[in-house]
Each structure stands twice: as structure tokens, then as C-alpha cells.
Amino acid sequence: MDTNTTSYTPLPGDPFLSGPPETPRRPLKGFAVIFASVIFLMSLVALIIHQGPQQPPDVMPDKQDEHHHPQSTTNTMLSWQRTAFHFQPEKNWMNDPNGPMYYKGWYHFFYQYNPRGAVWGNIVWGHAVSRDLIHWLHLPLAMVADQWYDINGVWTGSATILPNDQIVMLYTGSTNESVQVQCLAYPADHKDPLLTKWVKYSGNPVLVPPPGIGVKDFRDPTTAWYITEGKWRITIGSKVNKTGISLVYDTKDFIKYEQLDGVLHAVPGTGMWECIDFYPVSKTSDKGLDTSQNGADVKHVMKASLDDDRNDYYALGSYNEKTGKWVPDNQKIDVGIGIRYDYGKFYASKTFYDQNKQRRVLWGWIGESDSENADVKKGWASLQGIPRTVLFDQKTGSNLLQWPVEEIEKLRLNKKNFDKVQVKAGSVVPLDVGTATQLDIVAEFQLDQKVVESAAETNEEFSCQTSGGAAKRGALGPFGLLVLADDSLSERTPVYFYVVKGSGGTVNTYFCADQTRSSVATDVVKQVSGSYVPVLKGETLSLRILVDHSIIESFAQGGRTTITTRVYPTQAIYGAARLFLFNNATDTSFTASLQIWQMNSAFIRPFSPDAASHSSFTPVTVFIKFIVPFGIFLTLYFVR
């Protein structure tokens, strides 16, 4: 968006908003000299500490520790489940990603958080910042439930960056009568790159449920996009009976709104739409687009999180700014009845445009698949998926491509290559990678094409969910990897392809993940997930898997189909976790080539509420107490 030609109305009651445009400058420039000096002086002490003896990150506690803790076996299992490089708070419950953005050199991430326990409730906004989307620094809570209009929860919302570095945050508040209303907040000081203090607009709420909409069916405003009439436009999720809808509003000042006639889009039978996302993707470029961009080379993505089945669906289509309507390219795969972002545990997702690297980045909430009692016992629940870049798939023209942000590769340690490993039908091949708890796996599979061509045709409909999992053998599948497996294979999580030759000789490929034997525990969800994955002529079957303790994120064919899996093994943990290739097909062998990296842990520094009260944290104190140590760590981390 061209800020030089954009007209806008400043927010009232905030003096900085009416000031003249500032010359762009590097973030935290004023702190540069102080930071360098402190790094030099304190790194000597930090180096000594750093060079001291350290316990390996993935070893079983010693026997003496077990002797002193009668419940150590259970506690050890629960402790192992906590991830090493996925974002999560130190304790308690977390759900939806909120208001992600890049601002003055920092990535900001807000999230739904319960400061009182490991179950949903008492929802406020947590806040963390990062330089690279991998290493994080927790900050004080951004917003708490302290007003009549949000006393029952500061629910999901989105950030919009306006000209002159203005930021507006629209969020849903649950009132003292549990009515869902839309509220406005903005930073107390837009010059603070950490955005440590937020102000709620005194005239909140700015939107209430319109006539015909239920008081509990009006939530989750999107990032606003600028339209040619000099207004900003947002959409909000709702429903009418069983039809999921997205309401549309225009505003000039984010205080007064005009509701457009009709809706942006609606799909009968899909139920309540929440956490709507609406954004452009380029049909010709591998760069992301600002949310306000439109044009001939642009498609628009409409995504809704379906409250009925707790999955995220998207569709590609065309957006008409004048009518305020969006139309899907293919009604057979419309929102809620077609393609999902992810076929596993992935919900309430939210993208943002990263102007720093000209990319669109996707966050998604990864809930638990164990029991609530287990969550309470371990003291935490849920995490966020590794942020993903999102692009239009120019080859298929019908899919998005999702891929882990490139920064995750900074955590790669020692690498092992396996070239052209032959895996015969009905066999399992161990891969000697050491402890297989934290891995980044890139693999390609080559089937025997003669066998594929001669395979019998079948009219049988295949579904990952109803196929019987990796134990069900077919002529051309399943085959892939056994992740988080123990030596005896009593616990394993297969991530695999299944190829079906249909009538007329068409070959369809499915990508699945099977939890049914992931754990001998009985209080966890065990199901098979996955879907069809487009494989074009001449393409090799490929996948990437990120393994991080209790989460497995899998990407097929460059990210056309993805599956996020939560697993809770009791034996395939710590040093007992292994990795295998497997081929459970009856008629074909395959050749696999793999690159596998051990992964380091991310640095996620907690915020301690005991260190100071929320009100005493200024940009300077936050910098001294948290940013300086954070910088020291990163310096040591990348030079070792």
C-alpha cells in the first residue's frame, strides 16, 4: 500500500496519531551503543557459564532422581512431551494466535492465554516478541479482562498497521452478559518497538451484533484492508441457522462502521464461522502481498475455522471490491466443504503480511490430543505450529503451498544423508540418526514405475480416515516413515503415502498420518488423518517432517497437503526414540533418499511476573531486564 497517497482519520484521544509522517529509521537505533557495550561486558560471564558442564537435552533422568520421586516415570513422560522449538508459554493454557505483525524490527505474537491454569477460561492476551520467529521473549500480558465489555474474555482479534506506524487492534470482547462485541485497542506509545502497553478505546465496544445475528455468534474481526473509496474494510465471522457467513463493515476511523448489504461469502451447512482470514496471493510471484493489494494477477483466499468440526478450511477465488463479494473458483471445494489448511490438529489460524521479507506467514493453534487431566498434571496445554509461508501453487492453480519459515533451518545441527535406500515390499529399514526426538527430515521416494503401470485398477474409494491406517496393505502403499518409534515398534507414528490406481489408469496419491499405534497409553486420541495430495506428471513424491517431541508437522509435495499430529508415546521417548523407513505395500518396492538433521532447541525466555508489576514495565526496563540477556544468548548461540 502506498502510504503517500492514503487518506485516513487519526484515532481520537491519542496525540501521536495526528503527528507528521516520520522518516523510516532502523528499530532500536538509540539502544545500539548501550547494547553493544553490555554485550561485551556481560558476555565474559555468560561465556563462563555457557562453557560449564551441561546435561544433554534428551537423556533420561538418573536413577537417583527416580528414587526420590515415586511418580518419576509418569512425570518423566509428561516432561518429555514439552516441545523444544515450538512456541508455547512456560505454563498454563494457550489457544488462538492473535494480532501477529512485524513492527520496528520485531515480530510480535499475541495469543489467547489463561494465566490461571491449563484449561480454557479466564482468557487474556499473552504477548511475545522475536527477531526471527524462532527465538522468543515473553513480555507482560498485553490486555486483560478488566472492562464490562470484555470481563468474560479478551477474545481473538487482528492487528492493522496504518500509515505513520499507527497500529489498531480490533478484538472480540465477551461482555458481562456474555454478548460478543468488537472492541478497539492501540499502543500507548507507538515509538516503543516492543509495544509493551496497550490502551483500550474509551468508547468500546465499537460494534455489537446486528439484527438477526445471535449475541454469541459474532466474533473474530480480521485485519483491515484499504479500499479505493478511502475506507478500511473488515469481515467478521457469524452464522444464520446452519449457514456460515462473513459479515462486512467499512470504516474511516475504526470507531464508526457501516455494514455492507449482504455478506462477503456464505456456505450453507457449514455452521458458525470463526477466526476468518481474508488475504490476497499473487498468481505470478513467489512474494507475499500486503492485505490491501488487489488486481488482475491476484487471487483472494477465504479461510474460516468451523466451530462445528474444529477444522480450518480455505478456498481460492475472486474478490469484487465494489460489491464487497467474494466468489470461489470452484464451488465444489468451497469454504468448509473442500480443502483444509491442515488435516491434523490445526485450528484458529491467522496470517499476517511480513513486510520485512515480503512474505505471508501463517500461524496455527495446535491443541492437545490427550486428556484434560493429563494437561492439568503437566501444567500446560497447547502450542503454536512452526510459522509457515503461504504461496499460491502456480503449478496446480488450485492449492496453496505451506512451508516452514526459512528461519527454522538455523536450528539444524548435524546432518545425515541416506542416498537411494532400497525398501522392499513388507519391510522396515532402520535409519541410524541417533535420538529421534528433534528432527528435520527431507525425503524423496521413487516407486518402481513398471509396477505402477501394471497395477490393477480399482474403483474403490480411498480415505486416510477409514482406510485402516498404515497396517492396511495395498498394492501401491502404504509406504513412508515411522516416526517416534521404539526398537520393538510397539509404539510408532507412520507418516506415509498411499497410491491408488483408479479406473481409466488414473493414479491418485494420498498423504496420511496414523496415530493408532503412537502410544500404549489409553487416554489419548488415536486416529488416522490425511487427504489427497496433487502429484503432477514427472514429479517425485516428496515430504518434509518436523519432529519436536509430542508434535509432528508433515508437508507433502512442497506443502500442498499438510498434517499436524500430536502424539504421546510412553516408550519411544528420550534416547529410545527411533526412526524407520517402512513399506507395507504388497506389490512394489521403492527407493528413498533422505536428508535428516538433528534440531537444536529454540530460546524462549519466560517473563516472570514476580520481577515487577505489569505497570512498572517500561520500554527501558524491559530492554535492560530481558532484551539484553536475550541478545547475549543469541550472540553465544550463533557463534558456537
Curated annotation (Swiss-Prot):
Active site as annotated: D96
Topology relative to the membrane: Multi-pass membrane protein; Single-pass membrane protein
Propeptide cleavage-removed residue intervals: 1-78
Transmembrane segments: 30-49, 617-639
Keyword annotations from UniProtKB, A to Z: Disulfide bond, Glycosidase, Hydrolase, Membrane, Transmembrane, Transmembrane helix, Vacuole, Zymogen
Residues reported to bind substrate: W93, M94, N95, D96, Q112, W120, W155, T156, R219, D220, E274, D307
InterPro entries assigned to the protein according to its UniProt record, in alphabetical order: ConA-like_dom_sf (IPR013320), Fructan_Metab_Enzymes (IPR050551), Glyco_hydro_32 (IPR001362), Glyco_hydro_32_AS (IPR018053), Glyco_hydro_32_C (IPR013189), Glyco_hydro_32_N (IPR013148), Glyco_hydro_beta-prop_sf (IPR023296)
Cellular localization per UniProt: Membrane; Vacuole membrane
GO molecular function: beta-fructofuranosidase activity
Descriptive protein name: Acid beta-fructofuranosidase 2, vacuolar
